[in-house]
Amino acid sequence: MKYLIASNKNWHKELSKSLQIKTAYQFDIINDETELTLERLESISPQIIFFTHWSNTIPKEIFTKYECIIFHMTDLPFGRGGSPLQNLIIRGHKDTKLSALKCSEEYDAGPIYLKEKLSLAGTAEEILFRASKLMESMIIKILLEK
């Protein structure tokens, strides 16, 4: 089985490699929105596309053809929309939940697969590192339930 990680962040290349080792599944990665095309996806043929850190709109023709799972750094439906980490920190939150949800036409409004607690202690880099590790365990849980 093939899966795809879509992330604007280079550190998710390591996430892709780690998941491949831990699950024995093939994980490809897309780091740029120009690569997220139907033609490219058809050549990869992923079972699921995991959007671990994606700041761009996902085209409808992609999320209707492929199972697309988005990770969002709030306890949805609270905090829907852009810049969730920054908004939580500005508002003084000490922790949040990382939500894994199905991509839908309305932003951050699809059915939720699962949520896990995420501490907001430390620098943004430390928080994002913890979130990446948490995403890894959440992806494994999602795959085990399939």
What does each model-found stretch correspond to?
Residues 1-146:
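One-carbon transfer enzymes
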